[in-house]
């Protein structure tokens, strides 16, 4: 049996703001902090509820600032307020847990760089006016504007315009899954604030809270909860304690956090395309060798790494494509194989009689689980004959070391696009893209898959021959509820309330 390693950790190559807001670039500077059932996806959590006796919840208190939401749902200042905005507003499409887009306010058609958004007819805003293509186009403009939380996912759009009941979109480069990015809120300015077409509408407004009631004119399935109370918290940094004290009923937390482990709350994993990985220095002899990177991947027990090191739930993966992605059939979790790992290193002449391999692992000391993860990786690699020296640095020093190439391996975390845009992994930008460059063959396979939607399995097979980076896992977000609520929740990062039409208490 393999020895079990007992150290903890995880890294993110990002700056995390627990309840922060504003623009979040797709790169190694994101926001995080949850805890949920280890390794479970939202679908796995839901499968155990089929035979449970269920009763309906009448109301729910959600941490959110109503005024900032209706002032601009695209760039409000608080993470949970942005998520709660999707109760009042709809997005053009809905994204499933398998990264498939479903028509909502629009039906998307097209291919390559040319796309048509056909607007659903008969949809009403809460002020009684009808949704038009101009409303969708205006909302797209707002979502692309400076300061919008959605700006970075829409930078590939070259132009967009209204034509009858459609919005015509031209992209800079072909993207087969462009529709996956259309998850921004659609809103219309009415009476000095933005109204929506969503599942709820304003009912009453008090000094510290706002009550929303079900939208009786909603075009889709009615929500199961009759009313939602939006509770404005004076201090955003005490949101976790507000949940613990019962001042709110639910809270979304993104990324690594020590707070969740101390919460007496039920929690649900939120599917997110947030990749944890090891990067390799292309200018060091050992890590520039693809066989060494293959050996490192083979030497890792990713499931145990998640179990012992992460402060959140996650899904193990040795590929940079999410395990739930519907267009990928290649298994994304390889079994740990120390014997093969050792043989690869021996064949490369790096281990064996009289020789050993020593590597440094750079990681950022910020965050709740980075040091634990780095330590656990070092413990696992030591069993394959690799001696790892840990180099933990504060964030700015960490990035300086990456810029100067002062590392063999580095621990990174990045939020990838829901359209499976992997370019930030190997195209260097501000605080992302460090490490080995893929071969032209691998890049061509990726571009084919990304632009056409076909060939993801071919890309996966080529990727495992090179491992320009070594994926570890995809971190889930966490949707926390007070113990009073045990609901049938299925959530995705773009819509925490994805199946609120079927939320019921499980007795």
Regions found by a protein language model. Name each.
Residues 213-217, 267-295, 299, 308, ...:
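A bilobed periplasmic-binding-protein/Venus flytrap-type ligand-binding module shared by bacterial periplasmic
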Residues 63-111, 118, 141:
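N-terminal lobe/hinge region of extracytoplasmic solute-binding protein
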Residues 159-161, 203-211, 229-284:
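Extracellular/periplasmic solute-recognition and catalytic clefts
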Residues 288-379:
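Append "and occasionally in soluble cytosolic enzymes with long acidic Gly/Pro-rich linkers
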Residues 348-416:
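Ligand/substrate-recognition segments at binding pockets and active sites
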Residues 49, 390-398, 423-486, 506-507:
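Extracytoplasmic/peripheral linker and loop segments enriched in polar/acidic and small residues
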Residues 106-147, 286:
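Aromatic- and charge-enriched surface segment that lines or borders ligand/interaction sites
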Residues 78, 170-229, 235-238, 343:
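Gly/Pro-rich hinge or "lid" segments in bacterial periplasmic/extracellular proteins
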